[in-house]
């Protein structure tokens, strides 16, 4: 069930249309919040309807507004590795570019060896992936009974093809494990 999907709005997204990143809903207070695609917006509209919004305080002390989406769909038109500078340290990030009619989306999946990026690339290697069909992306984070997390991006391709990322799939036998990173002691 997809509760909120990115569609055309009146907000400007920069040089490549609209730009999204993955973060957890209420993630500054709840480290186990539901992952969403976050899109920066100038201000939260008066009429919210069923849309989700969140305001976060940045490191510089300024507040930033975001609209949250559970899923984004479009035709995959490019995959890039972009180098981003965080506090003087370069990081390689995986970025997907989608087109949906007149709209272009840039989706930052995080570090190239992170779980969202690795899971997405495994799914795009699925032999049933058809680049001529739309993809629908939805980030997830599921905690199992032992307390460990299964984190990734669910990808539907076309009308009913869910792309697989199972380790036992023959096309994934030699793929490396995602890097486990300790962030702020966690």
How would you label these PLM feature ranges?
Residues 2-109, 121-127, 142-181:
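OB-fold ssDNA-binding interfaces and closely related basic DNA-contact patches used
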Residues 110-118:
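GIY-YIG-like beta-to-alpha core
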Residues 117-138:
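Short nucleic-acid-contacting surface segments enriched for D/E, G, S/T with interspersed K/R
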């Amino acid at each position: 069930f997809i509760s909120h999907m990115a569609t055309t709005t009146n907000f400007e997204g920069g040089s490549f249309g609209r730009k999204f990143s993955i973060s957890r809903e209420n993630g500054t207070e709840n480290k186990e919040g539901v992952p969403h695609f976050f899109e920066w917006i100038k201000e939260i509209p008066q009429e919210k309807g069923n849309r989700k919004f969140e305001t976060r305080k940045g490191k510089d002390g300024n507040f930033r507004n975001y609209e949250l989406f559970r899923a984004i769909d479009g035709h995959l038109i490019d995959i890039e590795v972009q180098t981003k500078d965080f506090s003087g340290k370069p990081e390689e990030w995986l970025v997907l570019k989608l087109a949906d009619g007149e709209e272009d989306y840039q989706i930052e999946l995080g570090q190239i060896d992170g779980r969202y990026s690795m899971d997405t690339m495994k799914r795009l290697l699925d032999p049933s992936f058809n680049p001529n069909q739309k993809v629908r992306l939805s980030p997830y984070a599921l905690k199992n009974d032992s307390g460990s997390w299964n984190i990734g991006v669910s990808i539907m391709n076309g009308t009913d093809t869910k792309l697989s990322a199972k380790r036992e799939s023959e096309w994934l036998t030699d793929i490396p494990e995602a890097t486990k990173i300790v962030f702020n002691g966690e």
